[in-house]
Amino acid sequence: AERREARYQRRKAARMAKKAAALREYGDFETVFSFERLYESYRASVRGVGWKASTQRYKAASLANVTKTHEELIAGKYRSKGFYEFDIVERGKPRHIRSVHISERVVQRCLCDYCLVPMLSRSFIYDNGASLRGKGYDFAVSRVTRFLAEHYRKHGREGYVLVFVFSKYFDTAQHE
């Protein structure tokens, strides 16, 4: 019993040390929002949307914009600019779009890439491929295919698939 308790305490201490190290790395505001990381987030945020006029304006003074954002964040004076809201009709279906400004996308990307994803992804199941690097559409399709084949081997054609559609989920989330 003493050996088990000692082993439990050692493992508990190791888990706590690992958690403390992660908190030091991902929980420090100045580290997460360092100029270098904000600039990397800016580069990632403009990838694929360089044709937009707002992105081109931001890119024209990118160093000044990233520096200003960094200074506001460190000083505690950064404020969200809110959303651009507009309506479109896509494949005959009207949609209400809420889009954030490129400068806000940079901050969100920095927070996600250097804090939230590293901290939270350790608790995700392997099969979660939602917006994780290296786990895109092909990963999700291969996992579903594998699970369906496994189910078919065990149970034949008996069974069912549940499909959930979250309608207006973004509208119900608190944005303040």
Language-model segments: which ranges?
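Non-catalytic, well-ordered alpha-helical scaffold segments
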Residues: 36-39, 63, 67, 104-109, ...
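Short, solvent-exposed loop/edge-beta patches enriched in aromatic
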Residues: 77, 103-105, 115-119
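Active-site-proximal segment of RNA-dependent polymerases
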Residues: 25-28, 112-174
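Non-catalytic, polymerase-adjacent accessory regions of viral genome-replication enzymes
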Residues: 1-67
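An acidic intrinsically disordered interaction segment
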Residues: 67-84
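Short, conserved non-catalytic motifs in the polymerase core
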Residues: 48-56, 81-106, 123-136
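Intrinsically disordered or highly flexible coil/loop and linker segments, enriched in small
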Residues: 38, 51, 75-79, 153-154
